[in-house]
């Protein structure tokens, strides 16, 4: 089955070149303000962002590799699907969009995404029920007018869920997915991976068939899947593994509504770099001052770089452990993704447009100096430098123009398919329905 949310990719932007003066080792308030002013004055008109284009998809550093693209135009209409032989026995199997596992982060982040109504690939097996379903069944040798009842239940986090339908045609394979009734609050509290017993039951033409019981891996909420190799049933009776790039999932860990953001803003204001947080209501200089104040406040929190990213492997799924904002603050540790979602959460709270820049093996932050539609330029920030006490402008220079993975040095790659370079626009993610994973008080 296609994981339809994997098709909802975000805009990629050719990044502007940033030039800035060299910075002193110690950032003082007055010097910082002058340097920020100089940064704005040094920009050339030719550095305006180019027209957004479709983002690159699979990350080449991922163990799950995207299949090579075939040259030539793909057929838009599939040949007539073969029908099962008269004596072909009916059978069914359980399936999961993330094979062998359930990722609470994926369930919570995509819970409010609406079906876009677009036609499926005509070569895919007919789907009944939830086209974005996480769990379902594959039905083999279906006859026209067969009446089905599909039921899914589990020993935790899933309430009994049911789908009833009548087959529209005779087909070798079809998929069926009830709208699963997840216990979202319980999913948000899963802090350690555990086994989950899930029962799949099919009734055909009034006859209850043998149930299928599967033990799935219920992942911890910090596990963020970003690439999938999903078995997809086809009308010709074959099941083909298809690659899905879902790096938009990192946007689910950006939580602009987190209750601890107000305290961070209070501490940022106490730095004296800015008097208020007005987002784009003020000028570009004030925008940089707001970002700088937040940077200083987080540095004073003593956050250091931590490279812990691994999760227990699941076949066909690439995932990374991502800390929530409160975890990075309380543990004073953050890796590249953690630091980026932390700063992005605060910037989005004060309505400064932020993005996550995902490159092979790394992630960093980007923000616009003013609204993009008003000519705002995109600047990158290397958030792993928080722990080094580096000035904000050093972090901007590294991520925007100096590092091998920087925006300037890889501008063309953000327009190339399969390059592994993607800009995850947080506003676009929210518009799509990618929700922040809710904060759970007292979660350990």
Outline where the language-model segments fall.
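N-terminal propeptides/low-complexity segments immediately following signal peptides
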Residues: 21-57
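A ubiquitous, low-specificity "background" feature that marks scattered single residues
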Residues: 8, 50-53, 67, 344, ...
């Amino acid at each position: 089955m296609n994981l339809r949310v994997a098709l909802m990719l975000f805009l990629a932007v050719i990044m502007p070149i940033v030039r800035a003066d060299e910075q002193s080792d110690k950032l003082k308030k007055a010097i910082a303000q002058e340097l920020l002013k100089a940064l704005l004055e040094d920009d050339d008109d030719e550095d305006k962002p180019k027209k957004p284009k479709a983002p690159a998809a699979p990350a080449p550093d991922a163990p799950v590799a995207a299949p090579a693209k075939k040259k030539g135009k793909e057929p838009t209409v599939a040949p007539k699907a073969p029908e099962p032989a008269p004596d072909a026995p009916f059978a069914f199997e359980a399936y999961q969009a993330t094979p062998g596992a359930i990722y609470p982060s994926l369930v919570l982040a995509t819970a409010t995404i609406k079906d876009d109504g677009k036609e499926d690939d005509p070569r895919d097996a007919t789907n009944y029920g939830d086209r974005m379903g996480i769990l379902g069944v594959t039905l083999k040798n279906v006859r026209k007018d067969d009446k089905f009842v599909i039921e899914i239940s589990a020993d935790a986090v899933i309430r009994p869920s049911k789908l009833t339908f009548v087959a529209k045609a005779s087909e070798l394979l079809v998929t069926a997915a009830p709208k699963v009734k997840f216990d979202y609050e319980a999913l948000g509290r899963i802090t350690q991976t555990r086994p989950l017993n899930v029962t799949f039951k099919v009734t055909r033409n009034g006859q209850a068939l043998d149930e299928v019981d599967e033990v799935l891996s219920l992942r911890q909420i910090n596990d963020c899947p970003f690439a999938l190799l999903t078995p997809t049933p086809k009308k010709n009776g074959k099941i083909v593994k298809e690659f899905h790039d879902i790096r938009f999932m990192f946007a689910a860990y950006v939580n602009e509504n987190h209750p601890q953001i107000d305290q961070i803003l209070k501490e940022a204001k106490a730095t004296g770099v800015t008097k208020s947080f007005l987002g784009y209501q003020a000028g570009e200089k004030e925008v940089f001052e707001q970002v700088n104040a937040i940077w200083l406040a987080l540095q004073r929190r003593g956050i250091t770089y931590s490279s812990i990213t691994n999760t227990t492997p699941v076949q066909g799924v690439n995932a990374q452990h991502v800390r929530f904002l409160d975890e990075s603050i309380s543990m004073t540790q953050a890796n590249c993704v953690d630091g980026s979602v932390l700063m992005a959460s605060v910037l989005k709270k004060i309505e400064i447009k932020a993005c996550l820049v995902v490159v092979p093996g790394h992630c960093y932050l980007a923000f616009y100096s003013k609204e993009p539609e008003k000519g705002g330029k995109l600047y990158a920030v290397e958030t792993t430098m928080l722990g080094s006490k580096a000035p904000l402008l050093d972090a901007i220079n590294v991520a925007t123009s100096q590092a091998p993975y920087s925006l300037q040095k890889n501008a063309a790659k953000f327009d190339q398919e399969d390059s592994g370079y993607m800009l995850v626009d947080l506003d676009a993610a929210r518009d799509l329905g990618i929700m922040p994973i809710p904060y759970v008080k007292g979660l350990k």
